[in-house]
Curated annotation (Swiss-Prot):
Membrane-spanning intervals of the chain: 81-101, 114-136, 149-169, 176-196, 211-231, 244-264, 284-304
Annotated GO MF terms: signaling receptor activity
Cytoplasmic side: 102-113, 170-175, 232-243, 305-317
Native species: Eremothecium gossypii (strain ATCC 10895 / CBS 109.51 / FGSC 9923 / NRRL Y-1056) (Yeast)
Protein name: ADIPOR-like receptor IZH1
GO biological process: intracellular zinc ion homeostasis
Length: 317
């Protein structure tokens, strides 16, 4: 009887020790959420100049989403595009009808469509980017998939930006608008074919990716020069709000160069792991670029519909 009781006590003790060990290991896993570059699987190693702060392969959408609740080297990348993306979605839903229509009731409501078109493009770009940075650590297949989605979002943003501004710039010349819009869509399609190629999404093609998107963005220079020749510089600058378009270009080009050359972590590996590395700077500059274009396309819309700048209104936009 006592022997049987002793065996039961031993069994209970072993079970308790096993449960304690399991709990301890689970606690360690929960505490140890971040990893160094050297601890990552090969497919996750993208930027060897960022040495720590990584979320390791999760194989779980739930764990990827949970990573949004603690600070890691992707947190700023996620939220710098998630928050503005939600803001653009709200603007897409209410800006034209509840803001412009109230402040300037005489404007043609039908002309809102290209303004909405741009806001939808900005939302799509930022939403795709946020999803990529949130879900990229799931697994290699998911990372490749969401990387393509991210790049397609960028192409959508560039396309919507160019077409929306061309619409107001060539408002009274539909044939010009159709020609340059068709050219923009053709270039976008060519870039999309490359983006969907798996080889294009490897680390070796990082500089080429930056150059490609920068070149596609700069293709908008062609209709800008043509418009300046056709309308004269002063009128064309007013039609497309050229000053803000130039600001936008500066932000995008600077962001692409920072991303492509991995500045500043190139000069101090490990010092900018959590805050201040190139991809975070790139994200912030992209957001600033989208704001400049929003300002430009809104001003262009008002100018075309009224022939006036309404600077007192636009200073708040």
């Amino acid at each position: 009887m006592s022997e049987e009781r002793g065996m039961k006590e031993q069994t209970i003790s072993e079970m308790a020790q096993e449960m304690a060990h399991t709990t301890s290991e689970g606690l360690k896993k929960r505490i140890r959420k971040l990893y160094t570059f050297d601890e990552l699987p090969a497919w996750q190693k993208d930027n060897e100049l960022i040495l720590s702060g990584y979320v390791r392969e999760t194989n779980s959408v739930k764990e990827c989403l949970r990573a949004m609740t603690y600070f890691n080297n992707e947190s700023i990348n996620i939220y710098t595009h998630l928050i503005p993306g939600v803001a653009y979605l709200v603007l897409f839903l209410i800006f034209a009808d509840l803001v412009l229509a109230q402040l300037l009731p005489g404007l043609d409501a039908g002309e809102h469509r290209m303004l909405r078109f741009y806001l939808l493009g900005a939302f799509t770009c930022l939403a795709c980017s946020s999803c990529f940075h949130c879900l990229k650590q799931h697994s290699e297949p998911h990372s490749r998939l969401w990387s393509k989605v991210d790049y397609l979002g960028i192409l959508a943003q560039i396309t919507c930006s160019t077409i929306s501004l061309l619409y107001y710039g060539y408002h009274s010349y539909p044939s010009h608008f159709v020609f340059f819009s068709t050219l923009t869509v053709a270039l976008c399609s060519a870039c999309a074919v490359l983006v969907l190629n798996d080889s294009f999404n490897t680390v070796a093609f990082r500089p080429l990716r930056a150059f490609l998107f920068m070149a596609f963005g700069l293709s908008g220079v062609i209709p800008v020069l043509a418009g300046s020749y056709q309308f004269g510089f002063a009128e064309w600058a007013a039609r497309i709000q050229l000053k803000y378009v130039l600001y936008e270009a500066v932000f995008y080009i600077t962001g692409a160069l920072v991303y492509g050359f991995r500045i500043p972590e190139r000069f101090a590996p490990g010092k900018f792991d959590m805050v201040g590395h190139s991809h975070q700077i790139f994200h912030l500059l992209v957001v600033l670029g989208t704001l400049c274009h929003f300002r430009a396309v809104t001003g262009s819309y008002i100018f075309i519909c009224t022939g006036k700048h309404y600077s007192s209104l636009l200073m708040f936009i």
